């Protein structure tokens, strides 16, 4: 009997596999790895891979399948897993990738995986490309990410879209907004929207960058400080405590959000968010902090380095 290991990027995808295999005579090992690799310090617990455990499971399995969602976080997780397997010199021939055209969590339990995506063997070229991709993302500046070769990206069907979406989440050249901040402001510019509406906008994005806990923390950040961009938020919750208090969560979720005058000015390109509010977040291995930082000019497709402090 073949020892099959299935790795997923979230618990919902693992739920699909468990439901699908519930009546099988041979049960695979199904392991969920819900790491947060976007806008999170890569050294933090939220982004930490239990490397020894995962590599041990991969080594012991006769066959391993990685169920890859098309969103950027799942693409990065795949790159990280293959990078670690490559560094550990595991047999890449036993690792197979299933690139879902949609999130695996949305697949009906009665639908076999082969009907959604056939497995692709992670050969040496895949492992080397994944290593280049992860190394570029974890670098202390986004320059290596921009310089990734089209050949490396092409080994994975959704990686080019993830590459582009992540560049767009760097602070923009004119407004200082990343893609996530821009999506929030753009969603409520016409009329007030509830927090639940904003969460759905993120979930339905063609290339969602962050999940619900991080969306909650982002809204709290945009509503806080001496120069808030949004108003109307009831309470402030972080990404790791948003489910601790049901009453607080209900009040937070039902908040009617609107743009402040500053928020409208930033969205219109009249004011630079980073210059006014500063910034304190991570983009891969790049720390974005203070009132000057790396930026992305989508029109010219160029990175703009932080301004050097005046002598």
Residue ranges of model-derived segments:
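A structured, charge-rich N-terminal accessory region that forms the first stable segment of a protein
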Residues: 1-47
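A conserved mid-domain beta-alpha-beta active-site/ligand-binding segment of alpha/beta enzyme cores
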Residues: 113-193
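Charge-enriched amphipathic alpha-helical scaffolds
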Residues: 203-236, 240-241
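A broadly used, surface-exposed interaction patch
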Residues: 38-65, 86-88, 93
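Short acidic, hydrophobic short linear motifs in intrinsically disordered regions
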Residues: 191-203
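Acidic beta-strand-to-loop metal/phosphate-binding motif
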Residues: 7, 61-73
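Accessory beta->alpha helical hairpin/"wing" motif in late/C-terminal subdomains of nucleic-acid enzymes
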Residues: 229-310
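Conserved beta-strand -> loop -> alpha-helix junction used to position metal-binding or nucleic-acid-contacting
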Residues: 29-37, 87-118
């Amino acid at each position: 009997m073949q020892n099959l290991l299935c790795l997923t990027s979230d618990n919902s995808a693992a739920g699909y596999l468990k439901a699908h295999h519930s009546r099988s005579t041979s049960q695979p090992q199904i392991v969920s790895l819900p790491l947060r690799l976007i806008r999170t310090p890569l050294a933090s617990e939220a982004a930490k891979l239990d490397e020894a455990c995962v590599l041990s499971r991969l080594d012991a399995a006769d066959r391993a399948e990685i169920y890859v969602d098309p969103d950027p976080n799942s693409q990065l997780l795949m790159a990280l897993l293959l990078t670690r397997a490559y560094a550990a010199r595991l047999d890449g021939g036993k690792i197979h990738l299933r690139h879902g055209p949609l999130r695996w969590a949305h697949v009906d339990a009665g639908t076999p995986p082969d009907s959604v995506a056939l497995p692709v063997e992670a050969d040496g070229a895949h492992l080397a490309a994944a290593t280049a991709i992860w190394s570029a993302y974890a670098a202390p500046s986004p320059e290596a990410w921009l310089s990734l070769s089209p050949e490396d990206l092409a080994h994975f069907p959704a990686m080019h879209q993830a590459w582009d979406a992540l560049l767009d989440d760097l602070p923009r050249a004119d407004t200082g907004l990343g893609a996530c901040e821009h999506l929030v402001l753009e969603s409520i510019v016409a009329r007030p929207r509830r927090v639940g509406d904003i969460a759905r906008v993120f979930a339905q994005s063609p290339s969602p960058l962050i999940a619900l806990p991080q969306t909650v923390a982002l809204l709290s950040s945009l509503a806080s400080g001496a120069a808030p961009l949004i108003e109307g938020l009831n309470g402030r919750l972080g990404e790791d405590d948003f489910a601790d208090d049901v009453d607080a969560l209900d009040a937070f979720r039902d908040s009617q959000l609107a743009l402040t005058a500053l928020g409208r000015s930033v969205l219109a390109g009249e004011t630079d968010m980073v210059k006014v509010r500063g910034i304190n977040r991570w983009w891969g291995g790049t720390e974005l902090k203070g009132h000057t930082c790396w930026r992305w000019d989508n029109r010219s497709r160029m990175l703009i380095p932080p301004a050097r402090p005046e002598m």
